[in-house]
């Protein structure tokens, strides 16, 4: 490319994926990730001067556009300046104010088949600690984001178990295999499980004589969130002082 002729992307997303603040969770999450995809792709190119997303706010339009209500839902905020999830993608790229948002309310009843699918953290913090029913599960950082060209890209939550399976007193190999399978069920559901998880299941059956009854029990106890005490999640955004290495929680989501 000719570096003497600046190249600027003047519009992306917008009418290609209209999103309302009251759309279902998967739609709002996809909207946010589409914005992150473009920002990450542009940041990876040295010969692109920048990009402008369409657009900041929803707006009134003519009778032939919008959702039959003469409103274009193209913004990362609604027309009253209330942020959609996609706004967090941009808010994360500054460091003046702490940001911590999740792509999910963590309510299984919001999703088809009670499968949450992939859940992302949006933050500009140095670390995010995840707790389930006050039990520590995992700590995430910006380095865990698949959006490697963004300073603060969305972070995929890949563990809902932590060390909780130690209560089952399994052998190390069995515990690792069960944890891998349960976390995969959380992300993909049964219908979209990767083939490698089927192989893991067969290995658990042959090596440790596990059966379907045991698998269902473990799923209901550690993943299913059905009945019993309500499952609560807590996420803490943590900033680290560069000079003293002291850590402080700057924002919490429950």
What are these regions (language model features)?
Residues 1-82, 86-119, 134, 143-144:
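Substrate-binding/catalytic cleft of secreted carbohydrate-active enzymes
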Residues 137-150:
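Solvent-exposed serine/threonine-rich low-complexity stretches and specific carbohydrate-binding patches
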Residues 243-254:
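Edge beta-strands of extracellular beta-sandwich domains
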Residues 166-180, 187, 224, 228-243:
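Short, aromatic- and glycine-rich surface loops/edge beta-strands on solvent-exposed regions
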């Amino acid at each position: 490319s000719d570096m003497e002729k600046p190249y600027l992307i003047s519009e992306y997303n917008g009418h290609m994926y209209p999103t309302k603040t009251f759309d279902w969770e998967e739609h709002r999450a996809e909207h946010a990730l589409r914005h992150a995809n473009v920002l990450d792709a542009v940041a990876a190119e040295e010969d692109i001067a920048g990009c402008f997303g369409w657009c900041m706010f929803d707006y009134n339009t003519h009778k032939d556009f919008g959702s039959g209500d003469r409103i274009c839902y193209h913004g990362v905020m609604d027309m009253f300046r209330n942020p959609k999830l996609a706004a967090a993608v941009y808010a994360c790229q500054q460091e003046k104010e702490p940001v911590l948002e999740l792509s999910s309310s963590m309510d299984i009843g919001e999703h088809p088949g009670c499968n949450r699918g992939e859940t992302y953290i949006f933050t500009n913090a140095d670390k995010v600690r995840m707790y389930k029913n006050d039990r520590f599960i995992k700590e995430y950082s910006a380095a865990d984001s698949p959006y490697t060209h963004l300073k603060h890209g969305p972070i995929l939550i890949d563990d809902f178990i932590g060390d909780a399976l130690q209560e089952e007193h399994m052998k190390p190999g069995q515990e690792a295999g069960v944890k891998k399978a349960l976390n995969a069920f959380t992300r993909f559901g049964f219908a979209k499980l990767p083939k490698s998880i089927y192989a893991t299941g067969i290995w658990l059956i042959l090596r440790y004589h596990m059966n379907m009854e045991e698998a269902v029990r473990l799923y209901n106890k550690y993943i299913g969130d059905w009945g019993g005490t309500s499952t609560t999640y807590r996420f803490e955004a943590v900033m680290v002082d560069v000079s003293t290495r002291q850590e402080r929680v700057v924002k919490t989501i429950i």
